[in-house]
Swiss-Prot record:
Highest taxon in the source lineage: Bacteria
Transmembrane regions listed in the UniProt entry: 7-27
Any single GO CC term annotated in Swiss-Prot or TrEMBL for this entry: photosystem II
Originating species: Synechococcus sp. (strain RCC307)
GO biological process, one term: photosynthesis, light reaction
Record-linked InterPro entries: PSII_PsbM (IPR007826), PSII_PsbM_sf (IPR037269)
UniProt entry tagged with the keyword Protease: no
Record's subcellular location: Cellular thylakoid membrane
Name under which the protein is recorded: Photosystem II reaction center protein M
Keyword vocabulary terms for this entry: Membrane, Photosynthesis, Photosystem II, Reaction center, Thylakoid, Transmembrane, Transmembrane helix
Length: 34
């Protein structure tokens, strides 16, 4: 299985973007309650 740079970046973005979005939501809800 060859590692493609574009595929690697796409996979990285596909994983990181929702994770960052959830972290931002989590921080916002915590700051509102606190």
């Amino acid at each position: 299985m060859e590692t493609n740079d574009l595929g690697f970046v796409a996979t990285l973005l596909f994983v990181l973007v929702p994770a960052i979005f959830l972290i931002i939501l989590y921080i916002q809800t915590n700051s509102r309650e606190g």
